């Protein structure tokens, strides 16, 4: 797939558009409501995330991509003027719907779109500005990311070795995985085992915001749809086509609320950030 480069790196003063994807259900979080409406310090995650974007001098309004049956977003007050689009079943489909809405509203293909997760309310303002400034100098875009600090293990799933007959047990030196027929009643007996350690020297953890040229983003998402690709973020779509996306060093404060115990850490981070602002004032 070839993309038109005429609106690429030469346009270093593009218009900036912002989008927050808030159409997901957050099944891993385990709450009865979508996690973007979880309250932290008296506001929803979504309100916090919009407020962070509002602190950037580059952003003056925000598109919220919500589920078709969402009845909450429009009852909330936000720090930016808001307009809406209806998302899809997958994250990339929600982003695609947002891109189409922006283009239909008159956005140019050379413009930049800042895509942020509703569940990342603690992103520092200077990181938002840094990734936007980096994307201005790139033909396709840039994303926030942090180098992986922990040791990474690749795993395999097997029955507990101690509970298996000796001739069925899979030991580390065998480098194979047992053929298991998994019944619902057997799931509690399955465990993850370390298979190998992954070299982390070139590994980064992707964050948001992710910032892309609008035209190329539309094209790569169309490619994803046509080829039924499985992607976990928008940068993945560019990677499939071997198109360069710049990595911009982010902050480890910019965590995503994914599991219930993440809320404890996020609350502490938000309180510390607020205290720092008060001290400056």
From Swiss-Prot:
Pfam families: IspD (PF01128). The record marks 28, 35 as: Transition state stabilizer. It catalyses: 2-C-methyl-D-erythritol 4-phosphate + CTP + H(+) = 4-CDP-2-C-methyl-D-erythritol + diphosphate. The record marks 200, 256 as: Positions MEP for the nucleophilic attack. It comes from the Bacteria. Keywords: Isoprene biosynthesis, Nucleotidyltransferase, Transferase. Its EC number is 2.7.7.60. One of its GO terms (biological process) is isopentenyl diphosphate biosynthetic process, methylerythritol 4-phosphate pathway. Transmembrane segments: none annotated. PROSITE patterns: ISPD (PS01295). Gene3D superfamilies: Spore Coat Polysaccharide Biosynthesis Protein SpsA, Chain A. GO terms for molecular function: 2-C-methyl-D-erythritol 4-phosphate cytidylyltransferase activity. It is an enzyme of class 2 (transferase). Pathway: Isoprenoid biosynthesis; isopentenyl diphosphate biosynthesis via DXP pathway; isopentenyl diphosphate from 1-deoxy-D-xylulose 5-phosphate: step 2/6. Catalyzes the formation of 4-diphosphocytidyl-2-C-methyl-D-erythritol from CTP and 2-C-methyl-D-erythritol 4-phosphate (MEP). Belongs to the IspD/TarI cytidylyltransferase family. IspD subfamily. This is 2-C-methyl-D-erythritol 4-phosphate cytidylyltransferase. The lineage of its organism: Bacteria, Pseudomonadati, Pseudomonadota, Gammaproteobacteria, Moraxellales.
